[in-house]
Every structure is written in C-alpha cells, then in structure tokens.
C-alpha cells in the first residue's frame, strides 16, 4: 500500500548511528494531515485521496473552501494535494508521521530554490573556455547550430531563468521518525527552501 504526507522543510542537521557513523539528514515537520475527500472512478473519473495540510486563517479563505473542509469536520487548509494509492483512507481521518518508519524508501517532492537569470555554465554545467588573456571565449554559450539552418534549434541549452521548478528526488531513506515532534528525518538533502512545502510519498521505483 502506498503512503504519503505533506510537510514543511525545517532545514538540515546531522545524527549519529549506534556505531558512531555521522549521517546528514533533512528535517521535515509534518503536522497531522486531514483527508478532505476520497475520489472514485464513479464520481470523479479517477481514484485519489485529497489531503490538506497547515490550517489557514478564516479571513484568508472563501465560502467554497470552508464548505469543502466542513464535510471533513475540519478547518480550511493552506495546502491541498492528492495522492494515489492511499487505501483505506476515510474523509476526516488524520495522517500522521508514524505511518512511516525508519528505513522506508520514499520519493520527496519540493520546489527548488530560484537562482534567477543564469548563464549556461551554472545552469547546464557547460565547460568554459580558456581563461588566458589571448582567448576571446570564456563563458559564452558557444555554437548554436549549423550555418545553413539560419536559426537556433529548439531545446538549445542557453542562458535563462534557473530554479524555482518542481523537483522530485527518488529513493531517499528515512533515518528516523519522531511522532512526538511530528518530524521525519530523511537521509541527504531535499529540494526547496526552509519553510517550503514538501511532499513525502512511497517510492515508486524502490528496489
């Protein structure tokens, strides 16, 4: 059965195993999520579980959102996402961090940090030219295609806005789960800035 939860990135720290090994981990705070709706093929055309996270102040919401949340006996949520494969979920039920356990393999999704307008070296990892004073080619994009075409081919890797994209890191391992603090510790780093929304779900390519 697939598992999933919404949370916020707190930052990074490190923990030590019993044999003294140091492990860098990302701290994800996931307060209890509320199941807002269970979608079915008969009524919605597909199966999914709609989950809400982070209570939204009443002044910032509207009547449709209030009515939708009231069906689950809860308050409107700041973040609403859908998961597929969450079997047995009922409207109004809560999903907590203890649905996961240490050693679980998960996929983590977030929005990467925006880097602004960047050149091809930083954005695509292109090699730079010689830096000697006789060279006129240092950090330019280089050839953009053949002469005869008289145009730049689609998909050419050039300078542009970098980051601020939805990124999923697959097959990360959960190091620890702290139910009393609503915290999940994931080995390694995950995309996104501090306080940004993080989606943790069972890995689809786990070995």
Swiss-Prot record:
Membership in a protein family: Belongs to the universal ribosomal protein uL3 family.
Any single biological process term in GO: translation
Protein name as it appears in the record: Large ribosomal subunit protein uL3
Bridged cysteine pairs (disulfide): none
Free-text function comment from the UniProt entry: One of the primary rRNA binding proteins, it binds directly near the 3'-end of the 23S rRNA, where it nucleates assembly of the 50S subunit.
Sorted UniProt keywords: Ribonucleoprotein, Ribosomal protein, RNA-binding, rRNA-binding
SUPFAM superfamilies the record matches: Translation proteins
GO molecular function, one term: rRNA binding
Record flagged with keyword Cell membrane: no
InterPro entries: Ribosomal_uL3 (IPR000597), Ribosomal_uL3_bac/org-type (IPR019927), Ribosomal_uL3_CS (IPR019926), Transl_B-barrel_sf (IPR009000)
Subunit structure: Part of the 50S ribosomal subunit. Forms a cluster with proteins L14 and L19.
Gene from which this protein is expressed: rplC
A Pfam family the protein falls into: Ribosomal_L3
Region (Disordered): 113-148
Source organism superkingdom: Bacteria
This protein's record includes keyword Ribonucleoprotein: yes
GO cellular component terms listed in the entry, alphabetical order: cytosolic large ribosomal subunit
Taxonomic lineage: Bacteria, Bacillati, Bacillota, Bacilli, Lactobacillales
Signal peptide limits: none
